[in-house]
Amino acid sequence: MAKEALIVKTTPLPQSRISFELEIPSETCKTCLNETISSISRSAKIPGFRVGKIPKQVLIQRIGITQLHASALEKIIDKSWQEALKIKSIEPLSEPELVDGFESVLANFSPEKPLKVTLQTDVAPELKLKKSKGLSVEISKTKFDPKSIDEALQKSRSQFANIIPVTNRAARLGDIAVVSFKGKYKDSDKEIDGGTSESMDLELEKNKMIPGFVEGIVKMKIGDTKTLNLKFPEDYSHEDSRGKEAIFEVNLKDLKEKELPELNDDFAKQSGNKESLKELKKDIEKQLKDNFEKTQKDIKIEALLDALTNELVAEIPKSMIDIEVRNNIEQTAQRFAQQGLDVKSTFTPELVKSLAESTRPQAEKNVQRNLALKALAETENIKVEKDEIDLKMKDYEDAISQSSKQIDIKKLTEVISNDLLKEKLIIWLEENSEVKENTTKTSKTTKNSKTTKATKTTKTTKTTKTSKTQNKKEKK
């Protein structure tokens, strides 16, 4: 007599879910139940019987048929689930959900009859781009500000300044104030979490602390105490404090100022290991311009990726977002551990919940963007060849050979492959999209006008493989 086969019927559901209706043969149910009883029998201890020699009926009486059925049912469902996935060649994204619930299935379970269950799981969504070529984006183009070079020099001077005590004047912007303070909410008189300090060195610069805090210390003298009535910004990092009014009692305990070094060749040698101030300025200018160009390029790429994502048609399952959120939290925990913090005590259930909520919007955006790039690779048949991966792997040979830790080569290869593919996709987007760069020039404000007149200039950049070829021909 032929062995009864598992019957599997699948039905697509919204949000990239799929339903599996399984009819499991009674033969499978009986086999799994007997295996469960045998397994428990080998380890169970019942007075009067040797381990592994307990009769089946005694075991059923002692443990109970319901408990044995429950253990067997878990095995039956898991085994049948794995077999169903192979039959249908489906890779699930999430653990299967038993639609009727385990208790309900258990109550109706009989090993003498075929078992019918319905399971649901998330699967990878079907991806489609409404459009891939000819995307059009508009970005704001800014010019490099030469003043940033002097600002960087002043920041460097500040870092190498001598700190000297101040005794004969009031506090002013640029000083270092040693303060103690205690804050409470105005409406509830409750102390602000993290709003108290016995002694803190505070550089009196605008935008430090909440609005009005630094300004309130300016003009205070050592020994002065002052009450500051302030308000937390609506976008403050701690949600509980947003928009709330607060009262801070501040005491100025000590005051210091920075004695800035002269801008000369000696300073260049001290701060940047350069032979002259002229050489230091050139080096700073190069770094700032490189960073500026990178930022401009990043802005363009972000705009192109957003435009591509807007063209994506896909029903994204919740589990994909959940996985991304979990990965983000794990990465945060790893950074905490690298900083020497105790992850177990730091990552309380409340913090994990807060992180999950705050990072979810960005996680959703990341998933959408990654799927859009995947869809682009499939639509335009963009791939990474093995020789490209091998060539890139050579850059890591020294690091791999010198590392004291075991390197997962397979995982490294996967990361390199993904990075190379993303680079190719972004280059393709740049070559096949239209970027409009808007530059705004502002005229001087006159006495008779309250508003500033602005002229808007639009520059369109469209780089395609065809245009590149044409340019080469024209040059020839």
From Swiss-Prot:
Localization annotation: Cytoplasm
Pfam family of the protein (one): Trigger_N
UniProt feature, compositional bias: Low complexity: 440-469
Key words, A-Z: Cell cycle, Cell division, Chaperone, Cytoplasm, Isomerase, Rotamase
Taxonomic superkingdom: Bacteria
UniProt cross-references to InterPro entries, sorted A to Z: PPIase_dom_sf, PPIase_FKBP_dom, Trig_fac, Trigger_fac_C, Trigger_fac_C_sf, Trigger_fac_ribosome-bd_bac, Trigger_fac_ribosome-bd_sf, Trigger_fact/SurA_dom_sf
Gene Ontology process terms (BP): 'de novo' cotranslational protein folding; cell division; chaperone-mediated protein folding; protein transport; protein unfolding
GO CC term (a single one): cytoplasm
Domain PPIase FKBP-type: 174-261
Molecular function via GO: peptidyl-prolyl cis-trans isomerase activity; protein folding chaperone; ribosome binding
Reactions the enzyme catalyzes: [protein]-peptidylproline (omega=180) = [protein]-peptidylproline (omega=0)
Region (Disordered): 436-476
Enzyme class: isomerase
Function text: Involved in protein export. Acts as a chaperone by maintaining the newly synthesized protein in an open conformation. Functions as a peptidyl-prolyl cis-trans isomerase.
Family: Belongs to the FKBP-type PPIase family. Tig subfamily.
UniProt free text on domains: Consists of 3 domains; the N-terminus binds the ribosome, the middle domain has PPIase activity, while the C-terminus has intrinsic chaperone activity on its own.
Protein name, per record: Trigger factor
Source organism of this protein record: Prochlorococcus marinus (strain MIT 9215)
Lineage: Bacteria, Bacillati, Cyanobacteriota, Cyanophyceae, Synechococcales
Gene name per UniProt: tig
